[in-house]
Structure formats: structure tokens, C-alpha cells
């Protein structure tokens, strides 16, 4: 099943931030969001709320059409990851991934994001750790200057 605009937990015009309520019927759904320059994928639902609130502020309203955010739990299978890369991430300039745990926590997704970035060096991949113990190892695989 392909989801483009399903019942989101968090709603902003045209679902720029997407968080699908966690029920079993959604576990294999394919996710698509409109293209944007900036993509934020996170393990933390509260991050989505913060971004949503930020985009509601008048001085950041212009960013609404250029940022997408998604909870990582919506990208569990290889098919979901591949589809999201093809339909949404391929059009981005910057992807920020915030993950709890090490690279193995979302290994296939990280591998595909690294391939996405390697294909075009102008693209930027920022990987943030949700825990201090993985901060260095995840930052090292980001494509931004570490200094």
C-alpha cells in the first residue's frame, strides 16, 4: 500500500511533517512526501513537534515548502526505505538523520543515504546521535566538515 497523505499524527499543510500513528496496519506502508531541499529523519517524535512548532512561527513560515520531516519508525523495511529515497530524498540537498544507537540500528537506511550522498557530492548528509556514546562514530560518517 502506498501512503502519500494518510492520517498523520502531526499535520502541517500538505504533510510536510509526517508521523503516522503507530498501528500494525501501517508497518509495511510506503511513505511519500512532496520534494524539498531539506529532509529530517528522526528517532524522536518530540523532534517532529519542535519542527512543526517552529514552522508555525511567522518568521519561519517561508521554510514550510522546503522542509520535510519523518519519524524513522515509518521506514522499517528495505522497500519503505528504497521508496522514500526514490520519491522524496532524491530531490533533497540536505538530509539530517537523528538516530538512537549505533550505525547498525538502521544499517540499510544509513547505507542507502551514504550511497545517495556519494552519487552527488553537492548533497549533504548529517548524522546526529541521540546518545553521547555514539556521537563520534555517527558524526564521522556524515558528509560535512567535522572541524
Task: For each feature predicted by the language model, list its residue ranges.
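An N-terminal assembly and electron-transfer interface module characteristic of large anaerobic redox
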Residues: 2-147
Amino acid at each position: 500500500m502506498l501512503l502519500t497523505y494518510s492520517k498523520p499524527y502531526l499535520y502541517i499543510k500538505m504533510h510536510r511533517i509526517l508521523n503516522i500513528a503507530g498501528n500494525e496496519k501501517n508497518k509495511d506502508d510506503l511513505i511519500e512526501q512532496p520534494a524539498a531541499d531539506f529532509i529530517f529523519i528522526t528517532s524522536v517524535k518530540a523532534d517532529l513537534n519542535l519542527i512543526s512548532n517552529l514552522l508555525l512561527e511567522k518568521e519561519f513560515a517561508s521554510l514550510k515548502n522546503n522542509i520535510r520531516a519523518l519519524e524513522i519508525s515509518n521506514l522499517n523495511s528495505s522497500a519503505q526505505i528504497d521508496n522514500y529515497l526514490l520519491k522524496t530524498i532524491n530531490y533533497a540537498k540536505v538530509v539530517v538523520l537523528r538516530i538512537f544507537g549505533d550505525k547498525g540500528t538502521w544499517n540499510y537506511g544509513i547505507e542507502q543515504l551514504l550511497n545517495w550522498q556519494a552519487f552527488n557530492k553537492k548533497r549533504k548528509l548529517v548524522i546526529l546521535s541521540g546518545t553521547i556514546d555514539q556521537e563520534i562514530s555517527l558524526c564521522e560518517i556524515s558528509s560535512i566538515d567535522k572541524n
